[in-house]
């Protein structure tokens, strides 16, 4: 509801809208002069058969202004009933709506508000008594009436069909009735028979249902067992594959280990660890040159490393034979190896040197080389105790510290550096390494199987 007010004329214009299309409406002029009787007629409830009481008299119906409920009995047992239409506003008033203008006497705002409230309440009451919301515009009302006419036609057609069926039933004679009674009895017997069959079928259905439940339960149990067996089979298959892989891996490792074992059995540890050879005029051990020449000044670090390998070789051969050297003890210590005097524990004979002027005046290095030559001589004598035919290619004179070339020039070469040339010292060291190589070969041949 919309409203507007003009201060000059003190006029309130109020518009209602259609409850279907929401278009503004103009009320009929009759709404301006609504009295109490007219409002009661518009708001009176619709009369239905459910509202009519059995004890109401014709006089009460007449006084109430409602048309009576008419029932016309007939001899054929069929009652004709006529239900009068509900009393409502005329078509003209139903199609005319919504505007409350100014009061005829120029009433106050209270009068206008009261009229608006009365009109609004009137529409609310009318909407509450039917399935249609009020107010409606003329077009929506026409549409609604068309729909109601269609429903009325459908209802009248149904009524005509019922009447025709009733007339057909009334025209049936007695014979048809007896025949129908017989057919009815036969159908009743057939019904009993079918009911009995249905009961039997129902019993069988219950039995089959119980059996089906048992079979389904058994099938479900078997499915679960099958799934469990499948999982176990898959797990065992996985374990088998893993074990097969492990077995193949172990077999490969065994073959590799056997190959390595066969290779190691054929490998001489001493020959593999200590490779003694020569490089020109130098004797070498593990590619370290032992000695130096004026034309080839070998670094002392390399010479010291060669002496360390030589000490380690003799120490390993002695341990293999169980030989304990007299007078000296070998101490392999890399390029700082030395010999320890057994008669004087505090005396160490270094088998390494840094060169320089001190090298010419310090005779500890020479004493250490002579002591080492003494240990080689003890090793030779120990071997000759068990093998009389054993003989080294170069004879050693420990007291003089020299090595003799018995199979060659017949000369002797000093292992000392003082008062000796580098050529002779280098040749003496080369002969000493050759003797150690022979000793290495003998130990390898004697202790190879062990």
From Swiss-Prot:
Organ and tissue specificity: Ubiquitous.
Keyword Transcription: no
Cross-link Glycyl lysine isopeptide (Lys-Gly) (interchain with G-Cter in ubiquitin), sequence positions: 402, 437
Main location, first listed in the record: cytoplasm
Renumbered residue ranges of the record's region Required for membrane-association: 425-450
Sections of the chain in a coiled coil: 142-270
Impact after mutating residue 93 to A: Partial loss of phosphorylation. Complete loss of phosphorylation and defective autophagic function
Outcome (variant: residue 116 to A): Decreases interaction with BCL2L1 isoform Bcl-X(L)
Additional notes on this entry: Expanded poly-Gln tracts inhibit ATXN3-BECN1 interaction, decrease BECN1 levels and impair starvation-induced autophagy.
Free-text function comment from the UniProt entry: Plays a central role in autophagy. Acts as a core subunit of the PI3K complex that mediates formation of phosphatidylinositol 3-phosphate; different complex forms are believed to play a role in multiple membrane trafficking pathways: PI3KC3-C1 is involved in initiation of autophagosomes and PI3KC3-C2 in maturation of autophagosomes and endocytosis. Involved in regulation of degradative endocytic trafficking and required for the abscission step in cytokinesis, probably in the context of PI3KC3-C2. Essential for the formation of PI3KC3-C2 but not PI3KC3-C1 PI3K complex forms.
Subunit structure as annotated in this protein's UniProt entry: A homodimeric form is proposed to exist; this metastable form readily transits to ATG14- or UVRAG-containing complexes with BECN1:UVRAG being more stable than BECN1:ATG14. Component of the PI3K (PI3KC3/PI3K-III/class III phosphatidylinositol 3-kinase) complex the core of which is composed of the catalytic subunit PIK3C3, the regulatory subunit PIK3R4 and BECN1 associating with additional regulatory/auxiliary subunits to form alternative complex forms. (Microbial infection) Interacts with human cytomegalovirus/HHV-5 protein TRS1.
Free-text comment about domains: The coiled coil domain can form antiparallel homodimers and mediates dimerization with the coiled coil domains of ATG14 or UVRAG involved in the formation of PI3K complexes.
Protein name: Beclin-1
Higher taxonomy: Eukaryota, Metazoa, Chordata, Craniata, Vertebrata
């Amino acid at each position: 509801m919309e409203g507007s007010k003009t201060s000059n004329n003190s006029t309130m214009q109020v518009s209602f809208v259609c409850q279907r299309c929401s278009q503004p409406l103009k009320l009929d002029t009759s709404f301006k002069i609504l009295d109490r009787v007219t409002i009661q007629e518009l708001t009176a409830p619709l009369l239905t058969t459910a509202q009519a009481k059995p004890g109401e008299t014709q006089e009460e119906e007449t006084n109430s202004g409602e048309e009576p409920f008419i029932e016309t009995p007939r001899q054929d047992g069929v009652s004709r009933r006529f239900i009068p239409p509900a009393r409502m506003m005329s078509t003209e008033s139903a199609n005319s709506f919504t505007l409350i203008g100014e009061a005829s006497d120029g009433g106050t705002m209270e009068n206008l508000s009261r009229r608006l409230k009365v009109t609004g309440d009137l529409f609310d009451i009318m909407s509450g008594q039917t399935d249609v919301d009020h107010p409606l515009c003329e077009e929506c009302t026409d549409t609604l009436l068309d729909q109601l006419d269609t429903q009325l036609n459908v209802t009248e057609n149904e009524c005509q069909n019922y009447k025709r069926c009733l007339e057909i039933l009334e025209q049936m004679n007695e014979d048809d009735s007896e025949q129908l009674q017989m057919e009815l009895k036969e159908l009743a017997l057939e019904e009993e028979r079918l009911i009995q069959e249905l009961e039997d079928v129902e019993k069988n259905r219950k039995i089959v249902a119980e059996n089906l439940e048992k079979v389904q339960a058994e099938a479900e149990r078997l499915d679960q067992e099958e799934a469990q067996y499948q999982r176990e089979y898959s797990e065992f298959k996985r374990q088998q594959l893993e074990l097969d892989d492990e077995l193949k891996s172990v077999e490969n490792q065994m073959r590799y280990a056997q190959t390595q074992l066969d290779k190691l059995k054929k490998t001489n540890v001493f020959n593999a660890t200590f490779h003694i050879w020569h490089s020109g005029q130098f004797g070498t051990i593990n590619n370290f040159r032992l000695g130096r020449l004026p034309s080839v000044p070998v670094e002392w670090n390399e010479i010291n490393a060669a002496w360390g390998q030589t000490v380690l070789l003799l120490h390993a051969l002695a341990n293999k034979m169980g030989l304990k050297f007299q007078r000296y003890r070998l101490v392999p210590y890399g390029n700082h190896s030395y010999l320890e005097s057994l008669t004087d524990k505090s005396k160490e004979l270094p088998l390494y040197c840094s060169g320089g002027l001190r090298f010419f005046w310090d005779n500890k290095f020479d004493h250490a080389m002579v002591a080492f030559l003494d240990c080689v001589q003890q090793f030779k004598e120990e071997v000759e105790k068990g093998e009389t035919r054993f003989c080294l290619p170069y004879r050693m004179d420990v007291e003089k510290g020299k090595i003799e070339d018995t199979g060659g020039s017949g000369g002797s070469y000093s292992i000392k550096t003082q008062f000796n040339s580098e050529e002779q010292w280098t040749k003496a060291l080369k002969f000493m390494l050759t003797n150690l190589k022979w000793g290495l070969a003998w130990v390898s041949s004697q202790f190879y199987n062990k």
